[in-house]
């Protein structure tokens, strides 16, 4: 009987040290590396030509002994538009990105302070879709085309500031660097599309295996990294 009581008390004490927060918010995305560049780079097959975008997300945080675990579901959009070559053609390129992220978070907050800090790391599953539009572009028929949906696995890290400015609600201001396509890179091509259209209607973050056989059609020479900085504001409510 004594052992049961002691076990119950220990379980209750452990449970009291576990916290749960849920919330949602908005974010700004700044593509980096091969995900950035210009639409001329996109037409040349070297980068994606994305400028910036926004995201909407839901976040959950579970506080354990000494550290937290967090999970995020987010929907992001990025786009770029401009010329295909200097003074020629029009290109509009947009991606929609659905991501699920999870990982550990280490709280660096001073005791009883309304301002806290954290650092974290995560793994992610990222699904891309989108459209690309060409007008008066050499080697590609004019029109709007769908991007074939593709899933990649990534990682990321960052940190943030926690502000307890009003009762119950914590404002989470985060900065993170995302590597969206660490695993799963591939080139997708068909023989039915005209000219170099295949290069643009799939994510094609791996080298075209036919690169070098025809410079007008097979243009993707290298693997392309899809990375981005992300700045977020999330309102979290304790449960």
Predicted regions and their residues:
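Predominantly the C-terminal beta-signal and adjacent terminal strand-loop region
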Residues: 166-239
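Membrane-spanning beta-strand positions in outer-membrane beta-barrel proteins
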Residues: 19-21, 68, 116-118, 154-156, ...
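Extracytoplasmic loops and strand-loop junctions of Gram-negative outer membrane beta-barrel proteins
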Residues: 38-44, 84-88, 139-145, 212-219
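Gram-negative (and chloroplast) outer-membrane scaffold detector with strong preference
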Residues: 61-140, 148, 165, 229-239
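Transmembrane beta-barrel strands of outer-membrane/channel proteins
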Residues: 22-28, 71-77, 119-127, 159-161, ...
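Short glycine/proline- and aromatic-enriched beta-strand/turn motifs that initiate or cap beta-hairpins
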Residues: 14-68, 223-239
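Transmembrane beta-barrel architecture of outer-membrane proteins
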Residues: 51-57, 95-101, 152-156, 170, ...
